[in-house]
Amino acid sequence: MWFFLSSLCPVVAERCRSLLVPEDSGVDVENGGKRTIPRSRNGMLGEDMDDAAPLDSGVSMSDMQMGSFSTLKAVKRAEVGGTGPKVGRPRKLSVYNPREMSDGNPGEDCLVAGPSAVSHSEGLSSSGKRRKQHLPFTVDDLDIMCGVPSPRSGAPCRQPLTCKSHSISSKRAVTGRRKPFDALLQDFKDNNSRKSQQADIPRPLATKVYCSGHSQRMRAVITSLYRESISGRSSLPQNEQTLALDANPQQQQQQHALMSLNKVS
């Protein structure tokens, strides 16, 4: 009887799907009663193909076992925690500043860490952006600009002659102009008024040049027909012109037919 029950138990358990293999029971106990998700074959091969950690890296064999973390991570953690260089983003390479080289041999003071430490005289700001460099003033610039020097930087004002930031007396005191300030100011106002008058002039309508294009042939044909009709009306007597203007298109055709018959008779 006992032998019969022992041979029947595996079959019943297989049908009920309640048979626990020793390996499965260990997995369930380690994960809190939850069954683990099977890993992909590529992931398992990737862990096996990791480069082995060097013997002098300070990584123990227990850390290099599969299941805790990858060997590459173990090497990085050992380097960060040890005396070796930290693993991370590489720093910018130092460059030599030739302006600070004294005897041809660059020293420690000549090292500059990147382009942000270049002097402002070279046109570069601390953030690495290039400053806007103004060209020096010329005689032509002084004739159309304010030119009053700034009390802080000493740079001349680049506003036009009608600048409202500076007084007229300070503008007159600027040296280097070809004419007096009053004459230059009058010429400046005259030029501006002339430009405004030219802008107010209406532009001409379509011309021969405008109608000469391939896309404007229809417009040219219509204008030519309109001119021919105007010339035909001007050749008629005054009473017939008034009748032609007041009549409808059909009446105009009838009038032209009657006029042609009268001429023939």
Swiss-Prot record:
Keyword vocabulary terms for this entry: Signal
Domain (SCA7) ranges: 133-200
Signal sequence annotation: 1-18
Domain of life: Eukaryota
Matching Pfam families: SCA7
A single cellular component GO annotation: SAGA complex
InterPro entries: SCA7_dom, SGF73
Segments for region (Disordered): 81-105
The name this protein goes by in its record: SCA7 domain-containing protein SELMODRAFT_431321
